Amino acid sequence: MDAMATTEKKPHVIFIPFPAQSHIKAMLKLAQLLHHKGLQITFVNTDFIHNQFLESSGPHCLDGAPGFRFETIPDGVSHSPEASIPIRESLLRSIETNFLDRFIDLVTKLPDPPTCIISDGFLSVFTIDAAKKLGIPVMMYWTLAACGFMGFYHIHSLIEKGFAPLKDASYLTNGYLDTVIDWVPGMEGIRLKDFPLDWSTDLNDKVLMFTTEAPQRSHKVSHHIFHTFDELEPSIIKTLSLRYNHIYTIGPLQLLLDQIPEEKKQTGITSLHGYSLVKEEPECFQWLQSKEPNSVVYVNFGSTTVMSLEDMTEFGWGLANSNHYFLWIIRSNLVIGENAVLPPELEEHIKKRGFIASWCSQEKVLKHPSVGGFLTHCGWGSTIESLSAGVPMICWPYSWDQLTNCRYICKEWEVGLEMGTKVKRDEVKRLVQELMGEGGHKMRNKAKDWKEKARIAIAPNGSSSLNIDKMVKEITVLARN
């Protein structure tokens, strides 16, 4: 842990993310940006996450910098190599029962009193109470799209109105989930299947209750932060602005960070290579360099999606038969209960046009000129990175807000093709060929439009830049009170 710079009194913000890769990445980016704006930062990870960073990025990656320190609290659960896949009930129970006291104990021992807390929205189960006990304000940072938040928010209403649970399993396939819901403000045309809900899940499921109850607490907090930009989700942002006193749309964060001159970046923070909890393989960039512009499909299903060996094999044959180059990220724990090993015959076919790696710097890959398409699980981090890079998508959502993101990618933003839930090699082949061929021309143009609109949002007078400045001013005022 680094020694804090205390020669000048600065607003002091404590960040606490939900302990998962995508949440931490989005939190760290905002923390870096506010640090560059002159705020003092304490970033709190769990012990387990802290150690994962040290393993993936080296022993000095969390040394911090003047005015930026990393701290840890124990998460109270045991961990195995597959610990985060899927999110375990034991972690959620520990968050609800153990994190409050541990977090308060940490904060009260810090050398400088904090100005405010920026909490992951899904940790509001204890951070709202912590803020009250500490006597400091809290801001909620929702590291998902505004449409994803709104979807989670209205699951309670779906249950109250009798749309869920399903009467029986036949409702999964009889067209019922195509029912259009017309009473969610700002989300015209949304279908039941587009809500962030696994419709086969018991409504008493711990993960479901945890994720749907968090937005219901949002009215207890006046400041809410969303990693999106105004022009991407205007009707939903308008609805949220009427609902809460202070809304900050601040994305895409990486584009804002890219504006910081290299000489002003703090090496003790930026050494977190890609903000990844897994060691990255740089060899894929040598392979990308050998390919023509817009000729490669990038394939990555995120850090927590899992599938059957049959599904992975179908993806493999579909990609191999498409006759397009592809970079495929296959995590060791991608397959449920088995090693992620492809059949030897398929491996031979893949060698002709494919490159397989276990992890990579996704944002660098998406920005590479050879990449022309992205086969994705539609996690929000992946989605906003793809939009920022102007790369169209093939969508295979796994769960939760990925389902909502898929709807917006394909129908509202018109930059994606949706796959069926059941993976079939012929469909994979067809969609890759459509995306990369003449059929994808309109999507490529729309993707370029969104890339430009994202850059307008982060320009000096853009909506996201102005919101970051408003947030800094608000926190500075809090520090003086």
Curated annotation (Swiss-Prot):
One Gene Ontology term of the molecular function aspect = steviol 13-O glucosyltransferase activity
This entry's comment on induction and repression of expression is:
Induced by blue light and red:far-red light in a ratio of 1.22.
Residues at which an anthocyanidin binds: H23
The entry's function note states: Involved in the biosynthesis of steviol glycosides in leaves. Converts steviol to the mono-glycoside steviolmonoside. Converts the mono-glycoside steviolmonoside to the bi-glycoside rubusoside.
Its family remark reads: Belongs to the UDP-glycosyltransferase family.
Entry's PANTHER family?
Answer: GLUCOSYL/GLUCURONOSYL TRANSFERASES, UDP-GLUCURONOSYL_UDP-GLUCOSYLTRANSFERASE, UDP-GLYCOSYLTRANSFERASE FAMILY
Name-wise, this protein is UDP-glycosyltransferase 85C2
